[in-house]
A protein has these predicted regions:
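N-terminal subdomain of nucleotide-sugar transferases
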Residues: 1-43, 102-103, 166
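Short N-terminal targeting/anchoring amphipathic segment
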Residues: 2-6, 68-89, 105-108
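Short catalytic/ligand-binding loop motif for oxyanion handling, primarily in non-cytosolic enzymes
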Residues: 12-14, 36-39, 85-88, 114-119, ...
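Short, solvent-exposed beta-strand-terminating loops
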Residues: 30-39, 108-130
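Glycine-rich, highly charged phosphate/nucleotide-binding loops
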Residues: 49-68
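Membrane-proximal helix-turn-helix segments that form the acceptor-binding/catalytic region
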Residues: 65-72, 93-102, 129-168
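Conserved nucleotide-sugar donor-interacting segment of glycosyltransferase catalytic cores
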Residues: 86-122
Length: 178
């Protein structure tokens, strides 16, 4: 089976790739290396701000274009959450649709923060989470920027698009079992 893993979350896709390769599958991992983890990847999408500055996003797109032969024609593609490429939300939506139409199945991994998760936590679901425990909201001031980022209209729309149009959702964190 030909598999593409897009994005990274604490070496989750890297570990998954190792297991799938041992089972005989052909796996390509495309990510930015998950920031400071700098995890191994086949297609490097890291933004080099020092070298390219504000043009670094174009370099990410160029790397994607140069690797279309690896990105298209997969049996399964799993994307890491809704922002799986280090670009703005609308670029992630465009790339999502391209991946969806050029591959057989696309799976969204629920591996990190997203607007839905924060909305549920604000309601107290589940009873314990990063931002809610002991019956009340916690760490709101510390998480204000993090939450504001995910509630930006472009990212909220991107989350809806990727979540509702994926063929399946895979939950990793206990918060997703709501």
């Amino acid at each position: 089976m030909k598999i593409l893993l897009v994005g990274e979350s604490s070496l989750l896709h890297n570990t998954l790739k190792k297991g799938l390769v041992e089972l005989g599958h052909q796996v390509t991992l495309m990510s930015d290396g998950n920031d400071w983890h700098n995890s191994p990847r086949d297609i490097d999408l890291r933004r080099n701000m020092e070298r390219y500055g504000r043009w670094s996003g174009l370099m990410v797109l160029w790397k994607i274009v140069c690797n279309l032969h690896k990105i298209c024609g997969n049996d399964i593609v799993q994307v890491h959450n809704y922002q799986f490429v280090p670009l703005m939300g609308w670029w992630n939506m465009l790339i999502f649709w391209f991946i969806k139409f050029t591959n057989k199945r696309i799976i969204k991994g629920c591996f990190a923060d997203d607007p839905h998760l924060f909305r549920q936590q604000a309601k107290g679901i589940p009873a314990y989470s990063d931002t809610f425990w002991n019956g009340k909201l916690q760490n709101i001031e510390e998480n204000k920027e993090r939450m504001a980022f995910h509630f930006m209209p472009q990212f909220d729309k991107c989350w809806h698009t990727v979540s509702y149009h994926s063929d399946a959702l895979i939950a990793c964190l206990y918060e997703y079992y709501l």
